[in-house]
């Protein structure tokens, strides 16, 4: 997947990375490379957490269980 991120230099010199498409998905790093590495981890964690919420909601509402099919 491709996500657009913004990078801004904070007053303390750290680089703040944010993924506007994913509310609250923000990270930082000492330099641009570290900030980008960290925001990739944050995006992965954000997507996983949202997936878990969706799975729980489906199971509670319908008694269904999701399965994963690799294509």
Description of each model-found segment:
Residues 23-32:
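A short, exposed loop/beta-hairpin motif centered on an aromatic-Gly-Thr core
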Residues 1-4, 10, 33, 37-71:
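Short, charged, surface-exposed hinge/linker loops at domain edges
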Residues 8-22:
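Short aromatic-glycine-(Arg/Gly/Cys) micro-motifs in beta-strand/loop hairpins
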Residues 19, 25, 46:
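Functionally engaged cysteine thiol sites
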